[in-house]
Structure formats: structure tokens, C-alpha cells
């Protein structure tokens, strides 16, 4: 068989064979899932995504809707130096179990999913942005972690933005 034929066969059968030998696993609990880089239904249901109503500046969730443009108490008392920010997830025990392994445990496989969530949460900010720049990492910390998490997230969020 010629190499183009083998390549065509591999492109068709390769992913199926690979999934049979190494099935995609949930990013949260390592259960088998149908799609690589995704969460199982149980882990998905445990995540608390930030949704309106929230602070117009920092996106801290409100218990009830105070109206458009309202700032939370912290932003009203001491305005942050940024104009707007968004968060994909409420930082709780479940989201912490995803964030910390990404940040400190070499779980770069989490970047794509987190980037998609960030792109969805910050769609209006990304649409208005001329540039997305990650926070630089000190060279010592970069040496210890081997990668800049903010840079990976920024790259993935921009790639996933509509």
C-alpha cells in the first residue's frame, strides 16, 4: 500500500483505535467521557458558573438583581484599577479542584476547557478588546512551573472567542 492510502486509512481509523486504547477522560474525575477535554455529567453539574446578576466591575455574583451597572460593596468602597473583569466560575471547592492542578500540577490539558469557559463568560469584553495580554510570570516562577498559566488561558480564550 502506498503511503497516501495508509495515511487516509489512519486518519479514518486512528482516532477510533486511539479512543479504544486510551479513551478520553473527564478533566475533573478521570471517568471515561465521550469527548476529549470535557467533563462528565457529574462534574459538570457540580460547577457553579458565574451568571448575571453580578457586579458591573468585578463580576462578583449578586443574590438578586440590583439593576444594570450596579457595583458590589467592595468595588464601591475601593474601586479596583481595572474597569471590567469577568470570571467563568465561582471559586469554590469544586472549581478549586480544577484550578489548582492547572496552576501548580502541570495539568495543561485543562487550559482548553477553561479558555472556552472564559471566552463565554467574557464575550462582551473580548469583543471590545484590541489586545489580550496575559499577566507576566516572574522568571523564577516560570522556571518552577515550566509554563505561564495566564498565557495559556489567554491564548485559549482568544481562540474560543466568537
Model regions: which residues?
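Glycine-rich phosphate/pyrophosphate-handling loop used in enzymes and phosphotransfer proteins
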Residues: 1-162
